[in-house]
C-alpha cells in the first residue's frame, strides 16, 4: 500500500555504504516499481528509473546477491517517462511511480502477479484481467501526520518521507479526491489557530457519499474555544468533524453519519471503519466478483472476512441466502445495520476469528454453493481446508497480498479446483501496491468421485 502516514509504522534505516557510482541499463521494474538492472553479475535495484533507461546511479546498500542504488543522472530517458504532476513527488513517501506512464505501471504489476502465481502454483497463466480506474483524484481516504515545528512556529501537515521519520509538509496531493485536496490549506489554517496546536497527532480525511469528513486525533482535551473553531470550520467548508482523544473513542462534533454506495446499495460506516480507498475500483471489483460467482437466485453463498458487507449485501440482492463471517465485532454490527437499512432479510452475519479453528461454528456446518473470501494481508490459511470440505462449485478469492493468495491457492488446487481466472486490481495507482482476485472452479464430476 502507499506509504501514507501510519502512527504505528516502523521505519528501517538501511546501513550506509561508501559512495560508489555505476552506469547501468534498466531491464525491468520489480513489483514495487523499482528499476532492476544488472552490474557485474549482481542485481541492482534503483529507485526512479524505468525499463530501457541508461542511468548513472549511486549505491546506497550492498548485499551479497543484490544492491540498492539511487538515481544520480539520467543518461537515456524512456519514452514512457512522464512529468509527475505532484510538486512533492520524490520527497513524499506516498507515491513511488508518478514518473511512469500508467500503462507501464499496470503492465508491470500484472506481470509481477502472474510470475508470483506461476512460481507458487506451477500453472502457466496466459493473461490476467485488469481492473482500474482513473490514475489521479481517486483516493477517498488519507491520514496526515501533524507536527508543530517549534523553531519556525508553524504546523506541518503531511506524509512521511520514504524510509524516514521526516515529515513532508503537503500543499497538494493530486491522488486525493478533489473534495479532500481542496481542504488541505483551509484545514491547515484552522488547526494552526487552535490553542492545542502543539498537541495534535494526526488528521484523517474521508470522502463519503454524503460529503467529506475529518477525524482529528488530539492528545489533550480540547478547550471549548478550539471546539467552536472546529465547528465554524465544519460549517464553512461543509464537512463533518469527529474528535478522537484516544485510539478507541470517537465523538461527532458536527455533521452526520457517513455512507458510501456500492452495487446500488447504501452502506453506513464509522469514520474509523475500513472501506476501500478507491471507489471506482471497488465498484468494478464487486461487479466482477458477482459475475465470476455467477450468482443464481437459488444459491447459498458464504462470504468470509466480510467486513461491513461490501460484498455480502450485493450478493444478498441476488442469492437465496448469504452468510457473512467477520472477526471485528463493530463491523459485524455495522453489517447487520446495513442489511436492515437496505431491507435485506436473507443475510446473516457471524462474529468469528477466522484464524481460529472454525469447524465447530454454526455456519461451518451449513452447505454453500459458492464462497467468496477477502482476507487481510496474512491470508486465509486457517479456513482453506474448511472451504475445501464445504466443496463449493465456485470460489472467488480477493487479496491484498499476492504472496498469500498464491500460497492459499495451492490448497484449493490440491483439492481438485482449477484456477480459471486472475485479475490485477490497480487500487493504488503510482504506488508499488497491487491487489488481486482469483476465480477457482471445481468440476462436479471430479468432486463426486472424491
Curated annotation (Swiss-Prot):
Q: Where does [4Fe-4S] cluster bind?
A: 86, 92, 95, 173
* TRAM domain sequence ranges: 15-73
* Top-level lineage group: Bacteria
EC number from the UniProt entry: 2.1.1.190
Catalytic reaction list: uridine(1939) in 23S rRNA + S-adenosyl-L-methionine = 5-methyluridine(1939) in 23S rRNA + S-adenosyl-L-homocysteine + H(+)
A GO MF annotation of the entry reads: RNA binding
Which keywords, in A-to-Z order, does the entry hold? 4Fe-4S, Iron, Iron-sulfur, Metal-binding, Methyltransferase, rRNA processing, S-adenosyl-L-methionine, Transferase
SUPFAM superfamilies on file: Nucleic acid-binding proteins, S-adenosyl-L-methionine-dependent methyltransferases
Question: Which residues make up the binding site for S-adenosyl-L-methionine?
Answer: 276, 305, 310, 326, 353, 374
Q: Name the Gene Ontology biological process terms.
A: rRNA base methylation
Q: Which PROSITE patterns match?
A: SAM_MT_RNA_M5U, TRAM, TRMA_1, TRMA_2
Please name the catalytic residues of this protein.
400
Q: Which family does it belong to?
A: Belongs to the class I-like SAM-binding methyltransferase superfamily. RNA M5U methyltransferase family. RlmD subfamily.
Protein known as: 23S rRNA (uracil(1939)-C(5))-methyltransferase RlmD
State the organism of origin.
Pectobacterium atrosepticum (strain SCRI 1043 / ATCC BAA-672) (Erwinia carotovora subsp. atroseptica)
Amino acid at each position: 500500500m502507499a506509504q501514507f502516514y501510519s502512527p504505528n509504522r516502523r521505519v528501517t534505516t538501511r546501513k550506509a555504504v561508501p559512495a560508489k557510482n555505476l552506469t547501468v541499463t534498466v531491464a525491468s521494474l520489480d513489483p514495487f516499481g523499482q528499476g532492476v538492472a544488472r552490474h557485474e553479475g549482481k542485481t541492482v535495484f534503483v529507485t526512479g528509473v524505468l525499463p530501457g533507461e541508461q542511468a548513472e546511479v549511486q549505491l546506497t546498500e550492498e548485499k551479497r546477491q543484490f544492491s540498492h542504488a539511487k538515481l544520480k543522472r539520467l543518461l537515456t530517458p524512456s519514452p514512457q517517462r512522464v512529468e509527475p504532476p505532484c510538486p512533492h513527488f520524490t520527497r513524499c513517501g506516498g507515491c513511488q511511480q508518478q514518473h511512469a506512464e500508467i500503462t507501464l505501471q499496470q503492465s508491470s504489476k500484472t506481470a509481477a502477479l502472474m510470475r508470483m502465481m506461476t512460481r507458487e502454483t506451477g500453472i502457466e497463466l496466459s493473461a490476467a484481467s485488469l481492473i482500474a480506474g482513473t490514475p489521479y483524484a481517486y483516493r477517498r481516504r488519507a491520514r496526515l501526520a501533524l507536527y508543530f515545528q517549534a523553531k519556525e512556529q508553524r504546523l506541518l501537515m503531511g506524509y512521511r518521507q520514504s524510509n524516514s521519520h521526516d515529515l513532508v509538509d503537503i500543499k497538494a496531493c493530486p491522488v486525493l479526491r478533489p473534495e479532500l485536496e481542496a481542504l488541505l490549506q483551509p484545514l491547515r489554517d484552522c488547526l494552526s489557530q487552535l490553542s492545542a496546536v502543539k498537541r495534535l497527532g494526526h488528521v484523517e480525511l474521508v470522502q463519503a457519499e454524503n460529503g467529506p469528513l475529518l477525524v482529528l486525533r488530539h492528545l489533550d482535551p480540547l478547550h471549548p474555544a478550539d471546539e467552536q473553531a472546529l465547528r465554524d470550520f465544519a460549517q464553512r467548508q461543509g464537512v463533518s468533524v469527529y474528535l478522537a482523544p484516544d485510539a478507541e473513542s470517537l465523538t461527532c462534533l458536527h455533521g452526520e453519519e457517513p455512507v458510501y454506495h456500492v452495487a446500488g446499495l447504501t452502506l453506513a460506516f464509522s469514520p474509523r471503519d475500513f472501506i476501500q480507498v478507491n471507489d471506482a475500483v471497488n465498484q468494478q471489483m464487486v461487479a466482477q466478483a458477482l459475475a465470476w460467482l455467477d450468482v443464481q437466485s437459488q444459491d447459498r453463498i458464504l462470504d468470509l472476512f466480510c467486513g461491513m458487507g461490501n460484498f455480502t449485501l450485493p450478493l444478498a440482492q441476488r442469492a437465496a441466502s448469504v452468510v457473512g463471517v467477520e472477526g471485528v465485532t463493530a463491523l459485524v454490527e455495522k453489517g447487520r445495520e446495513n442489511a436492515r437499512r437496505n431491507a435485506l432479510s436473507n443475510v446473516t452475519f457471524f462474529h468469528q476469528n477466522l484464524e481460529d479453528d472454525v469447524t465447530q461454528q454454526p455456519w461451518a456446518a451449513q452447505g454453500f454453493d459458492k464462497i467468496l473470501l477477502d482476507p487481510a494481508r496474512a491470508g486465509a490459511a486457517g479456513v482453506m481446508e474448511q472451504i475445501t470440505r464445504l466443496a463449493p462449485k465456485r470460489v472467488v478469492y480477493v487479496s491484498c497480498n499476492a504472496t498469500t493468495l498464491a500460497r492459499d491457492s495451492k490448497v484449493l488446487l490440491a483439492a481438485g479446483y482449477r484456477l480459471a481466472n486472475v485479475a490485477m486490481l490497480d487500487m493504488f495507482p503510482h504506488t508499488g501496491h497491487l491487489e488481486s482476485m482469483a476465480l477457482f472452479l471445481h468440476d462436479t464430476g471430479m468432486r463426486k468421485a472424491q
